[in-house]
Amino acid sequence: MAVKLGTLLLALALGLAQPASARRKLLVFLLDGFRSDYISDEALESLPGFKEIVSRGVKVDYLTPDFPSLSYPNYYTLMTGRHCEVHQMIGNYMWDPTTNKSFDIGVNKDSLMPLWWNGSEPLWVTLTKAKRKVYMYYWPGCEVEILGVRPTYCLEYKNVPTDINFANAVSDALDSFKSGRADLAAIYHERIDVEGHHYGPASPQRKDALKAVDTVLKYMTKWIQERGLQDRLNVIIFSDHGMTDIFWMDKVIELNKYISLNDLQQAKDRGPVVSLWPAPGKHSEIYNKLSTVEHMTVYEKEAIPSRFYYKKGKFVSPLTLVADEGWFITENREMLPFWMNSTGRGNGWQRGWHGYDNELMDMRGIFLAFGPDFKSNFRAAPIRSVDVYNVMCNVVGITPLPNNGSWSRVMCMLKGRAGTTPPVQPSHCALALILLFLLA
């Protein structure tokens, strides 16, 4: 009798410990700057790779990013399920007055400090702590020790990954799954964002970048079959934000026309969202002067709209400037972020940007998924970037940490048992194993 009961308890322990998808692998793609309408039904007709993925899996109408609709804030929102004011990665550029340290879009040495990253635990850290093997390719932050943890493998981002780099990363990730070296692989690709910035979201260059990604994804579905992974691997594709047109010729707000820049202790970023720290005694003067400027809004920290889920962030500045869509804030025109174009000089004008109000249509991103745990040919209602984390946790079979995402917005895309409840608490498994031990 004890043996039979022990066997039943063992089955219970294993069943509770692992949802239906727990032994399956997950391949994640973060395609930077990928606006939702880039894969409209009309556009899909000339994108066979994406079209196949949509027919085999899930496509949401659009994904609303967190505010600000910039890269680093949403990189972390996607991987933690938390708003920026919770995970603390509130911008591409940040400053901490206490330490006088800066985070400058991840390129300066101080950007690697735990100060910026330890505000929340991203999924890859949780999985690594759970003895899962995580492979990351060009993913911003994978080179950082977060809460004392690094992923199993990190191919560090140093320059914009080429199309060949992207294809090689996909192939290597699939080989890692087949050999058992990886449980999660995460691949970051930036070219669509870069071309959208340089030439504009509707440009031939941006469309060519998308076609290059489409070609790799078309091969990927074939490679999955060739490696026999089709029943063991789920694939999720998402973006951090969209892109809109900007017009430097007539839509630039130059701060030096309204205030003295010497009255600022610090200023961070240029574009749709700019952070200002007035010098002592200058706060009211700067606020009053900037309040009259057209095509932007200046917020004192406490007055930032609650819907942005931003103002409680510990790195948020005393004054935050938010531009109207298409407008660009800078100190002066000489400080605009030109790029090195075909002339070989840094004088190229940017034609696209992001970071604006996250509810604007052009800021919307994408979410696609396919694999054994996802419904086929399923169109889902819009979701938000905070929701993606719960989907990933479910399909890898790990309990999500407390987060701001909504399970009700995403459960419809999962099929069978995977779509009924989030992963179970590990305490249930522990209880069953303890009972089994006592009966042994």
UniProtKB/Swiss-Prot annotation:
<feature type="binding site">
    <location>
        <position position="193"/>
    </location>
    <ligand>
        <name>substrate</name>
    </ligand>
</feature>
<feature type="lipid moiety-binding region" description="GPI-anchor amidated alanine">
    <location>
        <position position="418"/>
    </location>
</feature>
<feature type="glycosylation site" description="N-linked (GlcNAc...) asparagine">
    <location>
        <position position="100"/>
    </location>
</feature>
<feature type="binding site">
    <location>
        <position position="32"/>
    </location>
    <ligand>
        <name>substrate</name>
    </ligand>
</feature>
<dbReference type="GO" id="GO:0006629">
    <property type="term" value="P:lipid metabolic process"/>
</dbReference>
<feature type="glycosylation site" description="N-linked (GlcNAc...) asparagine">
    <location>
        <position position="341"/>
    </location>
</feature>
<keyword id="KW-1003">Cell membrane</keyword>
<feature type="active site" description="Nucleophile">
    <location>
        <position position="71"/>
    </location>
</feature>
<feature type="propeptide" description="Removed in mature form">
    <location>
        <begin position="419"/>
        <end position="440"/>
    </location>
</feature>
<dbReference type="GO" id="GO:0098552">
    <property type="term" value="C:side of membrane"/>
</dbReference>
<dbReference type="GO" id="GO:0019695">
    <property type="term" value="P:choline metabolic process"/>
</dbReference>
<feature type="binding site">
    <location>
        <position position="354"/>
    </location>
    <ligand>
        <name>Zn(2+) 2</name>
    </ligand>
</feature>
<dbReference type="GO" id="GO:0047390">
    <property type="term" value="F:glycerophosphocholine cholinephosphodiesterase activity"/>
</dbReference>
<feature type="glycosylation site" description="N-linked (GlcNAc...) asparagine">
    <location>
        <position position="404"/>
    </location>
</feature>
<keyword id="KW-0732">Signal</keyword>
<keyword id="KW-0336">GPI-anchor</keyword>
<dbReference type="GO" id="GO:0008889">
    <property type="term" value="F:glycerophosphodiester phosphodiesterase activity"/>
</dbReference>
<keyword id="KW-0862">Zinc</keyword>
<feature type="binding site">
    <location>
        <position position="240"/>
    </location>
    <ligand>
        <name>Zn(2+) 1</name>
    </ligand>
</feature>
<keyword id="KW-0325">Glycoprotein</keyword>
<feature type="binding site">
    <location>
        <position position="241"/>
    </location>
    <ligand>
        <name>substrate</name>
    </ligand>
</feature>
<dbReference type="InterPro" id="IPR002591">
    <property type="entry name" value="Phosphodiest/P_Trfase"/>
</dbReference>
<keyword id="KW-0443">Lipid metabolism</keyword>
<feature type="binding site">
    <location>
        <position position="197"/>
    </location>
    <ligand>
        <name>Zn(2+) 2</name>
    </ligand>
</feature>
<keyword id="KW-0472">Membrane</keyword>
<keyword id="KW-0449">Lipoprotein</keyword>
<feature type="binding site">
    <location>
        <position position="32"/>
    </location>
    <ligand>
        <name>Zn(2+) 1</name>
    </ligand>
</feature>
<feature type="binding site">
    <location>
        <position position="241"/>
    </location>
    <ligand>
        <name>Zn(2+) 1</name>
    </ligand>
</feature>
<feature type="binding site">
    <location>
        <position position="71"/>
    </location>
    <ligand>
        <name>Zn(2+) 1</name>
    </ligand>
</feature>
<dbReference type="GO" id="GO:0046872">
    <property type="term" value="F:metal ion binding"/>
</dbReference>
<comment type="function">
    <text>Choline-specific glycerophosphodiesterase that hydrolyzes glycerophosphocholine (GPC) and lysophosphatidylcholine (LPC) and contributes to supplying choline to the cells. Has a preference for LPC with short (12:0 and 14:0) or polyunsaturated (18:2 and 20:4) fatty acids. In vitro, hydrolyzes only choline-containing lysophospholipids, such as sphingosylphosphorylcholine (SPC), platelet-activating factor (PAF) and lysoPAF, but not other lysophospholipids.</text>
</comment>
<feature type="binding site">
    <location>
        <position position="193"/>
    </location>
    <ligand>
        <name>Zn(2+) 2</name>
    </ligand>
</feature>
<feature type="binding site">
    <location>
        <position position="71"/>
    </location>
    <ligand>
        <name>substrate</name>
    </ligand>
</feature>
<dbReference type="GO" id="GO:0005886">
    <property type="term" value="C:plasma membrane"/>
</dbReference>
<feature type="disulfide bond">
    <location>
        <begin position="142"/>
        <end position="154"/>
    </location>
</feature>
<comment type="similarity">
    <text>Belongs to the nucleotide pyrophosphatase/phosphodiesterase family.</text>
</comment>
<keyword id="KW-0442">Lipid degradation</keyword>
<dbReference type="GO" id="GO:0008081">
    <property type="term" value="F:phosphoric diester hydrolase activity"/>
</dbReference>
<dbReference type="InterPro" id="IPR017850">
    <property type="entry name" value="Alkaline_phosphatase_core_sf"/>
</dbReference>
<keyword id="KW-0479">Metal-binding</keyword>
<comment type="subunit">
    <text>Homodimer; disulfide-linked. Homotetramer.</text>
</comment>
<keyword id="KW-0378">Hydrolase</keyword>
